[in-house]
């Protein structure tokens, strides 16, 4: 009898606890996960944008830029290496029938390697500002013209597939005239 009572209590606790939580927050698990991952990804984007804005302003030394790039590669969450993790989480929340969002996921899986590779180039630049500037230009080109517009598509796809999730868009570094416009400006 004790085993049956325990089994029923366990079943009731695990079965009914989740819907109660959902009713209390008003969000489905998918909507909550979508919102959490979008917010986390926006934090990551803001950190990378901050670095790119400082690099464009020319207010830090080559050594400082190298150290900041290393931080973006090593620190998680809130860093460049966390963005692919956010991509994978949100890709699982996008409907496979959403061809636009799924194409953006595929693009980002390829493109992120270029951003991370260029951050590594900055870290290993040996305080050579020409190398750093070249790598920053390549990162800006990738982010302004491909990464940020694709992230917007992933955000839209995840939100569309998870009612209750909050719509969001990205913003680029100051050098992006308009993400996806095909141009950026770097001094």
Each predicted region: which residue ranges?
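Mature, structured extracellular domains of secreted fungal proteins
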Residues: 18-187
């Amino acid at each position: 009898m004790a085993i049956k009572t325990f089994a029923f209590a366990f079943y009731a606790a695990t079965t009914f606890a989740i819907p109660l939580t959902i009713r209390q927050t008003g969000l489905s698990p998918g909507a909550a996960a979508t919102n959490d991952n979008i917010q986390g990804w926006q934090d990551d984007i803001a950190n990378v944008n901050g670095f790119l804005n400082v690099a464009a302003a020319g207010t830090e030394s080559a050594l400082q830029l190298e150290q900041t790039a290393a931080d973006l590669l090593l620190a998680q969450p809130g860093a460049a290496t966390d963005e692919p993790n956010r991509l994978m989480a949100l890709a699982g929340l996008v409907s496979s029938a959403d061809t636009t969002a799924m194409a953006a996921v595929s693009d980002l899986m390829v493109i992120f390697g270029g951003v991370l590779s260029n951050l590594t180039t900055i870290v290993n630049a040996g305080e050579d500002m020409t190398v750093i500037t070249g790598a920053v230009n390549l990162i800006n080109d990738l982010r302004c013209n491909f990464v940020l517009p694709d992230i917007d598509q992933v955000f839209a796809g995840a939100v569309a597939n998870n009612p209750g999730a909050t719509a969001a868009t990205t913003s680029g570094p100051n050098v992006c005239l308009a993400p996806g416009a095909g141009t950026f400006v770097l001094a």
